[in-house]
Amino acid sequence: MSDLPPDLVEDILSRVPATSLKRLRFTCKQWNSLFKNRRFTEKHFCKAPKQSHVLLWKDYTVCPMSINLNFSGSSIEFKSVLSLKDSHYNSEQVYIAKVFHCDGLLLCTTKDHRLLVWNPCLGETRWINFENDYKPYSRFSLGYKNNKSCRSYKILRFWTSYLTPNHIGLRYNIYEFTTDSWRVLIDKVSLNYFLIESENGVSFKGNTYWLALDEETNFLLGFDFTMERFKRLCLPSNKNCDTMVLSVVREEKLSVSHQNFCSSKMDIWMTNRIDSETAMSWKRYFSVEFKILSMCHSLPFCNSFLIDEEKKIVISTVRGNENMVNIIGAYNAYYAEVPVESTNWPCSPYFVSYVPSLVQIQQCKSKENNKTSLEM
């Protein structure tokens, strides 16, 4: 390829999946320099195939998984835990309490209440400063503002606060990577809904979405990082008695599982467009049945799930069962349980749909050399 014009080489490499291109990074100086070129990484993000990988959070760690889906016998291979070491603390292991994925970046809340952004593919990290203002039970999400030339990443942080002794409200902050600082977005907003997911929500096309509940109905709550405002959207079902969980498919589709307490069926709904607050098109992609379970077993309600579109299979972690992954197929009432190594933490493990990317973590100029060492 050394005889090809540089523009053509760049165009070819921009179509190579991130994990494959990473192996070619040090083939020559020209290719290595592309990894530091933001224009190229933006081009690669738009053109390269999205290869979805499965990560499992459990016991304060993130573990890659390989899932073999076969109706004659499915299996799961758990690979080595991704090692994240902190050079600020004698290269000690970083224990991750929560993880949120956006564009190949992992926003991690640590066990000792710190916050960092991590690109496992590139081995880059950036610690986020709280300025001694950490709030217990804060929720965090990562998204971006859509610019013409590139994406500008931000972090949303919100937590509950008492407006009066008997009245609870919410407070919202936005973190800007360029200034390494937080600013107040909304202060002391009256709380008239509740988030009904135990997870942190999901990222879809740069925005974050959660399942929420008010006095009358379930709905989808979205945060637009470009406009910096919340929006309320419809769900396939809005009954308060139903159980729903959000997921994403290769960062291209938003998916929701729907279970009714009175039914043995789980419906999988999907959409690839969210145009406005009033119009949103959900399509029921397939359904799975739990008829194979005996009457003495309660239905397994999932707290996270992934789907295989081609085989129409749901892979889920189960509420209240820290040591099991369920695999349910739409055909022939297929059902299997795959054990997970025992956990020492009383929270159910959950899946993270991870798509490796070359997205660079924007470093504040004053802290460009203050990076955490990473081992994978």
From Swiss-Prot:
Signal peptide bounds: none
Gene3D superfamilies: 1.20.1280.50
Highest taxon listed in the record's lineage: Eukaryota
F-box domain: residues covered: 1-44
Protein name: Putative F-box only protein 9
Source organism: Arabidopsis thaliana
